[in-house]
From Swiss-Prot:
UniProt-annotated binding residues for L-ornithine: 168, 232, 236-237
Enzyme class, first EC level, given as a word: transferase
Gene for this chain: argI
EC number(s) stated in the UniProt entry for this protein: 2.1.3.3
This protein's name: Ornithine carbamoyltransferase
UniProt organism field: Yersinia pestis
Organism phylogeny: Bacteria, Pseudomonadati, Pseudomonadota, Gammaproteobacteria, Enterobacterales
Function recorded in the entry: Reversibly catalyzes the transfer of the carbamoyl group from carbamoyl phosphate (CP) to the N(epsilon) atom of ornithine (ORN) to produce L-citrulline.
Reaction catalysis annotation: carbamoyl phosphate + L-ornithine = L-citrulline + phosphate + H(+)
Family matches, as PANTHER family: ORNITHINE CARBAMOYLTRANSFERASE SUBUNIT F-RELATED, ORNITHINE CARBAMOYLTRANSFERASE, MITOCHONDRIAL
A GO term, aspect molecular function: amino acid binding
The entry's keywords: Amino-acid biosynthesis, Arginine biosynthesis, Cytoplasm, Transferase
Length: 335
């Protein structure tokens, strides 16, 4: 029986460094098989529930296509498609769905919700995103980094993340760096740093794995020598508009632009973004942002960087599929 069978995937620190590498190796194998047309279906007859309290493009498509590729069937429960937490408790929902499904994905708000689902469902539960963590995204990121620097192991790579580091991406990056021994720099104003106690705990683990975690407000110091630059949106659609101006003013200096790429001193530096990105005014929100906040060239990243040869964001997006498939196969298949 494989080491992942019937386990949950709630956050990265639930796994050992070796287990994270094993999942990445499985994703690489599954991706190769899909590309060559020789993929073997290991989830035939399995039924999967996808609970989305927050809408999504990449996460939903990745789970659905991964399931179909492997012969499984899915039921999508959107923001208005279930009674979870409204007419029915999370605990009761978990016990009902666990009788009908072989695996459950949750994308929503508090981490406690997905943990409660896992506690009572009796089947593997996977975290597609919560306010605190985004572990499936980090698996895709690590796979993408390995692919683009094949001659470097993860524990020899340097990644600088610019922007608001207090969110689920900042937390999951900390966990990932600590586990694989990466050199991680969180480059942000102090007001946007993660919780200190959590940072300290990840730094302690990083010391054991050979990693290094640095927090700095200094952009030049933070990005110097980086192999990868990473950013995410500065504001979320669910946040009140009143906080947008303050956040944007705070983070404007941390925009990823060509000047920042030059500061790395690495002409081969690559750019990562978990998407969607506000890099132009070709969307309703993007146009509104550009006009209202004087951001004609993009918000967290400029159009110039996003469309450049440095950008590997669509390789990164594709790898959501292969890494999510690896998680499902590993936790629902005995072999």
């Amino acid at each position: 029986m494989n080491q992942f069978y019937k386990r949950h995937f709630l956050r990265l620190l639930d796994f050992t460094p070796a287990e994270i590498i094993a999942l990445l190796d499985l994703a690489t194998e599954l991706k190769k098989d899909k590309k060559s047309g020789c993929e073997q279906q290991k989830l035939v007859g399995k039924n999967i529930a996808l609970i989305f309290e927050k809408d999504s493009t990449r996460t939903r498509c990745s789970f659905e296509v991964a399931a179909y590729d492997q012969g499984a069937r899915v039921t999508y429960l959107g923001p208005g498609g279930s009674q979870i937490g409204h007419k029915e408790s999370i605990k009761d929902t978990a016990r009902v769905l666990g009788r009908m499904y072989d695996g459950i994905q949750y994308r929503g708000y508090g981490q406690r919700v997905v943990e409660t689902l896992a506690e009572f469902a009796g089947v593997p539960v996977w975290n597609g995103l919560t306010d605190e963590f985004h572990p499936t995204q980090l698996l895709a990121d690590l796979l993408t980094m390995r692919e683009h620097l094949p001659n470097k192991s993860l524990n020899k790579m340097t990644l600088a993340y610019l922007g608001d580091t207090r969110n689920n991406m900042g937390n999951s990056l900390l966990e990932a760096a600590a586990l694989v021994g990466m050199d991680l720099r969180l480059v942000a104003p102090k007001a946007c740093w993660p919780e200190e106690a959590f940072v300290i705990s990840c730094q302690a683990l990083a010391q054991k794995t050979g990693g290094k975690i640095t927090l700095t407000e200094d952009i030049a110091e933070g990005v110097n020598g980086a192999d990868f630059l990473y950013t995410d949106v500065w504001v979320s659609m669910g946040e009140p508009k009143e906080v947008w101006q303050e956040r944007i003013n705070l983070l404007k200096p941390y925009q990823v632009n060509m000047r920042v790429l030059t500061l790395t001193g690495n002409p081969q530096v690559k750019f990562l973004h978990c998407l969607p990105a506000f890099h132009d005014d070709q969307t309703t929100i993007g146009k509104q942002m550009a006009e209202q906040y004087d951001l004609p060239g993009g918000m967290e990243v400029t159009e110039e960087v996003f469309e450049s040869a440095h950008s590997i964001v669509f390789d990164q997006a594709e790898n959501r599929l292969h890494t999510i498939k690896a998680v499902m196969v590993a936790t629902m298949s005995k072999i």
